[in-house]
Amino acid sequence: MNLVVLLILTLLLFIVSYVVDAGQVILVDSNITRSFVDMEADFSPSVTTVETGVVYVAEPLNACRNLRNKPEQSPYGTSPLVLIIRGGCSFEYKVRNAQRSGFKAAIVYDNVDRNFLSAMGGDSDGIKIQAVFVMKRAGEMLKKYAGSEEMEVMLVPPNTEDSVWSLYASIALILSLAIFCVMVTCVFFYRYCSTIRNSTSQFNGMCRRTVKAMPSVTFTCAKIDNTTGFSCAICLEDYIVGDKLRVLPCSHKFHVACVDSWLISWRTFCPVCKRDARTTADEPLATESTPFLSSSIATSSLVCIDSPPLGSSVSFSPAHVSSSFIHQFVRSSPMNGSRISENLRRQASPLQSSSQRSHLSMKSSHSLGYSTMSPLNAMGMSPYRPYPSNASPGLFSSTNHLLSNYTANTFSHFASAHSLPD
């Protein structure tokens, strides 16, 4: 890409030099007028005014030797011009031969048909006549009308005003191209930096320091070392006595270089069992029954105790109630653990003293024929869990006070101190 830009800039500079130095050779006759673009020689005086004269063909045509023809003095006071073809010798030598022969200006035309003009270079020491270069078709046209005094040739200097505007336009074009190249370069650089940044952000390996901190052993025998096998599962090379093996938390072993490269540059799990190498060795493996969330992030909803079917007679001690129901609620709501423990201690003695009264109350409730289902069941919601028959009213009143945010609408007027649901 840089080479293409350099070539374009060179071409533009060449066009600028062509536009600035380009003049005109005009062929004027009573019937025709032809204009041709020319380029002044670097070593000859510049054409500052319009030069008018009759053109003559050089003999020899390439003017590499002294010219045999001499210019004739025109009665109209015009200057004699000589027409020379390119090739055979240098431009400077041609112009010097034309100057020695007495011509006032030399017109050199190309010997090959091209679409551009070539600059004529040489030593300007002693050169006093003007010299211009034209294309091949212009030289052939001038050669056709050479020697005719009725056909005049005019050398017109470059238009200074047009040249300045052309120079400004060329400079603007070059600046626009340069800005475009800079923008393209910035875009490519931005994409390159984005690619590097994305590849860095998508790094999936482990820290080198963490990998190096993993334990390693020296291989002695596969059976003694309890290794994965007799060969490394990464490079498939057999273990040799004395090889350093890296031990992952899953107890699989690999060559140190192999598994270090795997963990640092590629993935963070064991290549064999896919266990995460960032875990500790005593951490239990994840199974299909492993919950997605740990117990510390468990839901804060009330955990109910499974009870036997309705109608069965089961006795629960206060200690059993406190160690099951309250313990499960504390696990589901860690924020209220200390508060529940304090209230539980306060209710320890009332529970023991009111055990018998609770038993009698349960019997009386059966004799009165109250329904064994709570109003919550009657509303079509979650099933009501029956409470133990020997539990005291104090336990339920305390629990109802502690769990007011969860069970405010659970108990009805049946859950009183003297009538509890079965």
UniProtKB/Swiss-Prot annotation:
Keywords for the protein's UniProt record, in alphabetical order: Disulfide bond, Glycoprotein, Membrane, Metal-binding, Protein transport, Signal, Transmembrane, Transmembrane helix, Transport, Vacuole, Zinc, Zinc-finger
Signal peptide start-end: 1-22
Intervals, Lumenal compartment: 23-168
Glycan attachment positions: 31
Region (Disordered): 344-368
Zinc finger (RING-type): 232-274
GO CC annotations on file: endomembrane system; protein storage vacuole membrane
Residue pairs linked by disulfide bridges in the UniProt entry: 64-89
Cytoplasmic topological domain: 190-422
Gene Ontology MF term list: zinc ion binding
Coiled coil: none
Membrane topology: Single-pass type I membrane protein
Compositional bias segments (type: Polar residues): 349-368
Record's subcellular location: Prevacuolar compartment membrane; Protein storage vacuole membrane
Keyword Metal-binding: yes
Domain PA: 81-146
Pfam families named among the record's database cross-references: PA, zf-RING_2
InterPro entries, A to Z: E3_ligase_sorting_rcpt, PA_dom_sf, PA_domain, Znf_RING, Znf_RING/FYVE/PHD, ZNRF4/RNF13/RNF167_PA
Biological processes annotated in GO: protein transport
Transmembrane region(s): 169-189
PANTHER family according to UniProt: RING ZINC FINGER DOMAIN SUPERFAMILY PROTEIN-RELATED (PTHR47168), RING-TYPE DOMAIN-CONTAINING PROTEIN (PTHR47168:SF5)
Function statement: Involved in the trafficking of vacuolar proteins. May function as a sorting receptor for protein trafficking to the protein storage vacuole (PSV).
Full protein name: Receptor homology region, transmembrane domain- and RING domain-containing protein 3
Species of provenance: Arabidopsis thaliana
